[in-house]
Swiss-Prot record:
This is UPF0208 membrane protein YfbV. Pfam families: DUF412 (PF04217). NCBIfam families: PRK01816.1 (NF002493). The chain crosses the membrane at residues 46-65, 69-91. Belongs to the UPF0208 family. The keyword Nucleus does not apply. The lineage of its organism: Bacteria, Pseudomonadati, Pseudomonadota, Gammaproteobacteria, Enterobacterales. One of its GO terms (cellular component) is plasma membrane. Keywords: Cell inner membrane, Cell membrane, Membrane, Transmembrane, Transmembrane helix. Its main location: membrane. InterPro entries: UPF0208.
């Protein structure tokens, strides 16, 4: 287990944590009913890919047609802010400590690693959603799917 994200509350740091969390979280169908991350990550990736071109198109269209620039700029800024909102949410989620029910499940999965003879680094601090994402990613690679039965 790598880390607990620093408690830095900076906006840029939250966005960076969001990117890291987005790369770490396993996109698995079995997790979708319990965690909103799958939907948020898909929407954020879509926004990162398509919103900047949409913003440029909006500005270009308004300038070409001689329309007002103010609403076009507002629309472009809104379109560009959507993926940033997703990254911020993911960053905030990554640094949130796990609630008691997920904390219990987190330790049960770690115990299954121990039963399988796979060494895990000790947990040093209160586990966060980032810690859970790292553990789940490893579990989907190295364990059978029975660890999902306890959810």
């Amino acid at each position: 287990m790598s880390t607990m994200p620093p408690a830095s509350s900076g906006w840029i740091r939250k966005m960076q944590l969001g990117q890291q969390y987005m790369k770490t979280w396993p996109i698995e169908k079995q997790l979708a009913p319990m965690f909103p991350e799958n939907r948020i990550i898909k929407a954020t990736r879509f926004g990162i890919r398509f919103m900047p071109p949409l913003a440029i198109f909006t500005l270009t269209w308004q300038i070409a047609l001689g329309g007002q620039l103010g609403p076009a700029v507002a629309t472009a800024l809104f379109a560009c802010s959507l993926p940033m909102q997703g990254l911020w949410w993911l960053g905030k989620r990554a640094s949130t400590p796990l609630p008691a029910t997920l904390l219990k499940w987190f330790h049960e999965i770690r115990d299954k690693f121990a039963e399988a003879g796979i060494a895990m680094a000790p947990v040093r601090q209160t586990p966060t959603y980032q810690s859970l994402a790292e553990l789940l990613k490893l579990a989907f690679k190295q364990l059978d799917r029975s660890f999902l039965d306890d959810i």
